[in-house]
């Protein structure tokens, strides 16, 4: 890795932002940890930031030469808030931007796909990370994790579709390389784990590793959409349910070598993630 200036991490307490901040600071890089509450992050300088409050943007960008961008959560049109900020960042001297997107959203596609499309014209050095679904969705604060704890059930409209679930630590490791390597990737990177699993497989692995029975219940698209509307805005719920339907049709049944290629090590398996969490909690 090359010596860098200061990296602004937007969403520094989130699933990938917190891990990216931790890996950067552990390697000796300077980090500004941005969030609405400016929550302290070990080894980083906390700074208040709200996508929807432009008054917070200039101070967050002060002294920064690269940014890690996590879009505003649940916003079906993040470009409206993100693109003005990115133009400001470019004017403020930021020369490298790494955007967190999704394997389900192509360049120019819905939601953050519009930001993806704009990024190469704004920054000479850039990358778009397009991870598959996070393994941490089943262990953290995600709706799947909550329903596993509360009901022993994973609810989806994904049927028997398979997904290359990826560990957030591996996403962060790729983000660190994309932010700090001498040459930026200047491309989008689809990030997956080493294998594809159905939600039935996920339930079976959780049951085997934890000893607690977990099952996958399959819902029709409409019921899944309606279930999600109790948790997120209606338009975003429809988009998430559409993603489940795409999984059912095979859209996420793939693996890539991007994690291994960028980090020099293979991605972690879901079983290894659960085994590690069980050891930490015992």
Provide a role label for each language-model segment.
Residues 37-39:
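Helix N-cap at the beta1-alpha1 junction of Rossmann-like dinucleotide-binding domains, i.e.
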């Amino acid at each position: 890795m090359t010596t860098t200036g200061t990296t602004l991490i937007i969403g520094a307490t989130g699933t990938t932002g917190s891990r990216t901040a931790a890996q950067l600071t552990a390697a000796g890089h300077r980090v500004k940890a941005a969030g609405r509450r400016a929550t302290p992050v070990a080894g980083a300088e906390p700074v208040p930031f709200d996508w929807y409050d432009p008054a917070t943007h200039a101070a967050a960008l002060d002294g920064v030469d690269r940014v890690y961008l996590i879009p505003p959560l649940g916003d079906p049109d993040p470009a409206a808030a993100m693109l003005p900020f990115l133009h400001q960042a470019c004017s403020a001297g930021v020369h490298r931007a790494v955007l967190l997107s999704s394997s389900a959203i192509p360049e120019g596609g819905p939601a953050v796909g519009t930001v993806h499309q704009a990024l190469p014209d704004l920054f000479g050095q850039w990358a778009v990370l397009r991870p598959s679904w996070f393994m941490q969705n089943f262990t953290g604060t995600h709706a799947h994790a909550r329903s596993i704890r509360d009901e022993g059930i994973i609810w989806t409209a994904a049927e028997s579709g398979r997904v290359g679930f990826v560990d957030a630590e591996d996403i962060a490791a790729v983000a660190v390389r994309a932010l700090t390597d001498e040459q930026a990737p200047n491309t989008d990177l689809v990030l997956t784990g080493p294998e594809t699993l159905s939600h039935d497989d996920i339930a079976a692995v959780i049951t085997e590793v934890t000893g607690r029975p977990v099952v996958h219940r399959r819902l029709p698209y409409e019921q899944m959409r309606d279930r999600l509307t109790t948790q997120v805005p209606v338009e975003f719920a429809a988009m998430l349910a559409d993603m489940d339907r795409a999984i059912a049709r095979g859209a996420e049944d793939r693996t890539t070598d991007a994690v291994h290629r960028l980090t020099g090590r293979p991605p972690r398996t879901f079983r290894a993630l659960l085994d590690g969490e069980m050891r930490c909690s015992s």
